[in-house]
Swiss-Prot record:
Family assignment from sequence similarity: Belongs to the UPF0145 family.
A Pfam family matched in the record: YbjQ_1
Protein name in the entry: UPF0145 protein SYNPCC7002_A1337
Alphabetized Gene3D superfamilies for the sequence: Hypothetical protein apc22750. Chain B
Entries under PANTHER family matching the protein: UPF0145 PROTEIN YBJQ
Length: 108
């Protein structure tokens, strides 16, 4: 399966469009990790724990996107776009949201 952020695949012809595919990954935050991340942010350091979560989330979203495209009989997903965000859950914390979208296609 080819995954691409571009709208074409070099050297391949798109023979049919199988529709838009999406994937969402949501992670809950950990209060202790948030506390230490906040301290690190105040002194200007990078928060490796969150970087690892986002990297893992991007990989999981791409795997889910690929799986959804395979269910449609696609050979590739083009025009992939990824986004991240947060969802506030009352006073209980924040959820981290990672989304991926693209167009599933068959190649000739």
């Amino acid at each position: 399966m080819i995954l691409s952020t571009t709208n074409t695949i070099e050297g391949a012809t798109i023979t049919s469009y199988q529709g838009v595919v999406t994937a969402e990954v949501v992670y809950g935050t950990n209060a202790l990790r948030d506390f230490f991340a906040g301290i690190r942010d105040m002194i200007g350091g990078r928060t490796a724990s969150y970087e690892r979560i986002f990297e893992k989330g991007h990989q999981e979203a791409l795997r889910e996107l690929e799986s959804n495209a395979q269910k449609r009989g696609a050979d590739a997903v083009i025009g992939i776009s990824m986004d991240t965000g947060t969802i506030n859950v009352d006073d209980k914390g924040v959820l981290l949201l990672i989304t991926a979208t693209g167009t599933a296609v068959k190649l000739g």
